[in-house]
Amino acid sequence: MIHQKYPINWKKKDFSIMIFCSIPNIATGILIKGGSNHFVVDPGDGILRDLNQEIGMKQIMDISDLFITHGHHDHVGGVWALLTYMRVMHKTSPLSIHYPEGCVEIESIYNAFKKVYSKTIPYKISLKVIKQSKNFKTKNITVRPFPVIHKEYLHDGVRTRQVPALGYSFIYDGIKICYGGDTAYCEDLVKQAKGADLAIVEAGHEDDTPDDMHMTMSEAKSIGESAKEYFLVHVPE
């Protein structure tokens, strides 16, 4: 295991990932680089600041894709800021936002942004709803979305419901990074993480406080150890 300390950096050949942070209920933010292309995964609060410090304005303008695992605030809290910054700085190349079917948070953010700035958006935004686990390619990476199991509490704080949630495998030049997002233990993540060059696995609970929303440390480690390298993220502080 590689010990958690943010930001986390990993690189193999010309494929790299930087996890700016992954703190439950606060924020997540991930930057993936494949060659000269940049992609953002789960742009939580603070992502605009982190991207500016790491890659700067010009390369932010060149970002072509956002990948959303689910709609909880700690994973999408920076979307509005990122879209607005791209507008203010006159991005002209298109932006695709990939997200699970039923993720109303992303659709609501997009609709509100479009309503507020309908006459002054210089770039095209395409919502790409993911309805099935099927490989697709964008720029120079192959992406494999897969279903995961994540829930949220209802208003009574007792009952729960399933939320639309995905994990993603990113493949570039034969190198595979698997990111599970927020999830309970699930077989689809087990399959995707096995043999990956890097697995990023959430460990939202200690072993003595298991639930059906997040994995325990032991569960997360068992999945991570099936990959060549792994990070445990989303560990409560």
Q: How does the language model describe each region?
A:
Residues 176, 184-237:
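Cap/insert and terminal regions of metallo-dependent hydrolase folds
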Residues 1-178, 227-229:
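Binuclear metal-dependent hydrolase catalytic cores
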